[in-house]
Amino acid sequence: EGDEERTLVASQRIKEEGLEDLVTVKLMDYRDLHKSGLTFDRVVSVGMVEHVGHANIPLFFKNVDSVLKEGGLFLLHNITNLVEVEGNKWITKYIFPGGYIPTLREEITVAADLNFHVLDVESLRLHYMKTLQEWVKNFEAHLDEERKMFDERFLRMWHIYLCSCAAAFHYWDIDIHQTLYSKGINNTLPLTRSYMYED
């Protein structure tokens, strides 16, 4: 599923829910946000910052800053490392060329330089470990179909990747966090997370 298809699916779901007047989906390169002339109350990034590369993390945050209104919220959902390391050479070579898994410390330091304030941080490590374990089961259950699309070398590589990532989350080599920032001061959110679970 490509970016264009995901954009269409998201737009269709928004329409089905009758939210067209409230929500718009835009397919854009993060490096072009500052040129867009757009402003948002909220920005959400899911699993994207890992793909910009270590050197571009400040640029990523600057572009979010350029479109987020004062007091606006920025939710960053991404895989994180415990310490600053180059990353797994095998994964960097075969799975995510140019990728880099940042630490919370790196992200928060860059964010603070731009007047972003941390409102909440949640680890979803165990959730993602279970997700990866289910992906492994699903992958193994559909090998006959996958063999029609990919060669054995790729299938072995992908299987190793999924299993090793599940193990990395299990043994806390890596984590996955949702970090909620405000641009400047935002004192409007409830004091606890309970509002997130209300209908």
Residue spans for each PLM region:
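A short acidic, Gly/Pro-enriched loop at the edge of an enzyme's catalytic core
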Residues: 31-43
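Substrate-binding/catalytic lobe of Class I Rossmann-like enzymes that use SAM or dcSAM, i.e.
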Residues: 79-189, 196-199
